[in-house]
Amino acid sequence: MAHTQEEIIAELGQIVEEVTGIEPSEVTVDKSFVDDLDIDSLSMVEIAVQTEDKYGVKVPDEDLAGLRTVGDIVAYIQKLEAEGAEAKNAE
């Protein structure tokens, strides 16, 4: 099942709070993890791992480096979910 942008942001907010203590309300689509939320690289890896577990996706390290904003991760998850649905439908 594909998730909406709002669902992903809400769930990502919970993950960010668990990892960093930042309030979920601070996690909005236009926020940069490093510049706006002041999240370090170690915390970003933990957020990525929990996001992978939550959505059943794999984010390669080279892709993770390009995911700088909350919106970037939302779009990436939606893309992976769409690709997964297409692959399932092709079977």
From Swiss-Prot:
Gene3D superfamilies given in the database record: ACP-like
Domain Carrier, residue spans: 6-81
Pfam families to which the protein is assigned, alphabetical: PP-binding
GO CC field: cytosol; membrane
Family matches, as InterPro entries: ACP, ACP-like_sf, Meromycolate-ACP, PP-bd_ACP
Top-rank taxon: Bacteria
Residues the record lists as O-(pantetheine 4'-phosphoryl)serine modifications: 41
Compartment(s): Cytoplasm
Pathway(s) this gene product operates in, as recorded in its UniProt entry: Lipid metabolism; fatty acid biosynthesis
GO BP, one annotated term: lipid A biosynthetic process
Record's comment on post-translational modification: 4'-phosphopantetheine is transferred from CoA to a specific serine of apo-ACP by AcpS. This modification is essential for activity because fatty acids are bound in thioester linkage to the sulfhydryl of the prosthetic group.
NCBIfam families: AcpM, PRK00982.1-1, PRK00982.1-2, PRK00982.1-4
Protein family according to the UniProt entry: Belongs to the acyl carrier protein (ACP) family.
HAMAP family xref list: Acyl_carrier (MF_01217)
Protein name (database record): Acyl carrier protein
Gene giving rise to this polypeptide: acpP
